[in-house]
């Protein structure tokens, strides 16, 4: 059953308390209840922006390199139903001043027919592809996968028929709560297969990359160099912001698209 407007307004008001909510997931009983109710069966992948990535494919086969945006385009093209939100819940709740609040998520699958029409609209394949492209041009990072939380707050189910494509900013993304979440939930949000983020010897420890750039605060300066910890989800923002081009993001194989199709397709039926 689709959610009324007042329900979403309450969520927007509660959004600033998301970090407290995340810490509750570490309590033994409460954490399991939250996981089952909001995150059961989830598998969510952050996709680095195309311009940040180096494909480690053989030189004689450059055509085989698949950019991360192609993964998003593939699922949009395959879906029978496509929905574009008129707003981003995260940016609305955080009153974002940097990125467009009106650039909302894309949802795919039959469950979108249950979303309140006041929140967005059904779109054609081309309209969805254009929306995704606008989001990329605005500097937003895609996240794709099954996210039961979206099914719950939208009242659109079952979650097995709702594929989420979020367009995330570093300042407002809900998943900035990852460092506070229990491992059980935290590990359901991962980087794209094969992604490696490396700080090179060109780093001078200026700290630019650690100043509100990483949405999970995975990078910091230790002594004279930047250090990336295990919470990194490979979004590539630090690569873009580094003034010395000292951070590199690469993919260590050229079969990203087949791997992502194989991983996501069994999770959500978008036919």
Residue spans of the language-model regions?
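General detector of N-terminal leader/presequence modules that precede the first folded domain
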Residues: 1-120
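Local cysteine-cluster metal-coordination motifs and their immediate loop/turn environment
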Residues: 86-100, 163-176, 201-216, 233-244
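Compact structured core domains
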Residues: 119-151, 156-157, 163-169
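Residue-level detector of anion-binding/catalytic polar loops
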Residues: 141, 238, 248
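Ferredoxin-like iron-sulfur electron-transfer modules
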Residues: 148-165, 184-234, 248-258, 267-271
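N-terminal cysteine/histidine-rich coordination modules
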Residues: 261-262
